[in-house]
UniProtKB/Swiss-Prot annotation:
Part of the 50S ribosomal subunit. Contacts protein L20. This is Large ribosomal subunit protein bL21. This protein binds to 23S rRNA in the presence of protein L20. The lineage of its organism: Bacteria, Pseudomonadati, Thermodesulfobacteriota, Desulfuromonadia, Geobacterales. Belongs to the bacterial ribosomal protein bL21 family. It comes from Citrifermentans bemidjiense (strain ATCC BAA-1014 / DSM 16622 / JCM 12645 / Bem) (Geobacter bemidjiensis). It holds the Pfam family Ribosomal_L21p.
Length: 102
């Protein structure tokens, strides 16, 4: 069984036992998180939401809180010798999907 979950402005296809890297979620390591914005549930019978599947949820457990790899942002203006280099590390959460309720 799988589901399509919407979180952090993105959509993820998940199954039970999967590890998922998402935008930072509130909570400590070991806490459980429940997603109620389920767009689709698949398996023996596929249910597509309009836009959400009613009474469906996905439960996950927070495995790690941290930062992603550094992304370098380089800006320059032509013929002016103007350059700017910035670095950015996005906060992220790693989850383990425990249960899909359809």
């Amino acid at each position: 069984m799988y589901a399509v979950v919407k979180t952090g402005g993105k959509q993820y296809k998940v199954s039970e036992g999967d590890f998922l890297k998402v935008e930072k979620l509130e909570g400590a390591v070991g806490d459980t998180v429940e997603f109620s914005e389920i767009l689709m549930v698949g398996g023996d019978k596929v249910v597509i939401g309009t836009p959400l599947v009613p009474s469906a949820s996905v439960v996950g457990k927070i495995v790690e809180q941290g930062k992603d790899k550094k992304i370098l942002v380089f800006k320059s203006k032509r013929r002016k010798n103007t350059r700017k280099l910035n670095g950015h590390r996005q906060l992220r959460t790693i989850l383990k999907i425990e249960k899909i309720n359809a």
